[in-house]
Amino acid sequence: LGLGVMGWHSFLQQKGLPFNSIASTAHTKNIFSDIRGKVEKASMDLALEYGEPLWCKGTGMRNTHLLAVAPTVSNSVIVGGISAGIEPLPANIYTFNGAKGTFIRKNKELQKILISKGEDKDQWWDQMLTEDGSAQGLPDNILTPEEKELFLTFPEINQLELVRQAAIRQRYIDQTQSLNLSFDVNDSPKWINQVHLEAWKLGIKTLYYLRTDSVIKGDLGSRMADCVSCDG
């Protein structure tokens, strides 16, 4: 058993919270501590109703394992293109190669803002598509600096922030979490090593993939073949 989550970055964007903000860190603690408390209560309630299994005798629990955060790449596409698991969105627009063809996927939260400004135009989406899905090159009269901060993509976010949020989350996860990191091909080995050491020092149990490719150059479909059994 391992209850997980999906759509973390999409949730933050819906709330208008940049991934690397203090408020996002606070939400990490509040939400995952709340999930842990409710999961434990649910397991205790099940133990009262159905009894404790032999391997849980004396614990008051029905389950030995409770939480595990899977990648959920496939599921996130199925439900409409929200962010996968706890991972930031890799791009604000990208091509998706699926079984039924190739599709263009857009960040719905970004699209809402562009629609509200009357700027949901191919011109801006085409620009982002040629810039690896980044919104940072849009004119400031189209997206303010604050809005650009909100729509930073996975490769554009400081990877130490992912690690620090994951460390907070890990306190409430009895198993582990699918934590990917993204680095530019020109990032120094020293920086990459620093991020990995920080993850170890903060008590993160595992790291999953280290990304160095662009979702635009490789399309999202190619990422979905990583691990069929755990992808979700």
Language-model region placement:
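Conserved alpha/beta enzyme-core scaffolds, especially Rossmann-like or related mixed alpha/beta domains
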Residues: 1-7, 12-30, 153, 170-188
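Short acidic alpha-helix initiation/capping motifs at coil-to-helix transition points
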Residues: 1-4, 37, 102-107
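Alpha-helical scaffold segments in soluble metabolic enzymes
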Residues: 7-10, 14, 30, 34, ...
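Catalytic alpha/beta core of large soluble enzyme barrels
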Residues: 67-232
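Internal maturation/activation junctions in enzymes
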Residues: 3, 12-72, 145-148
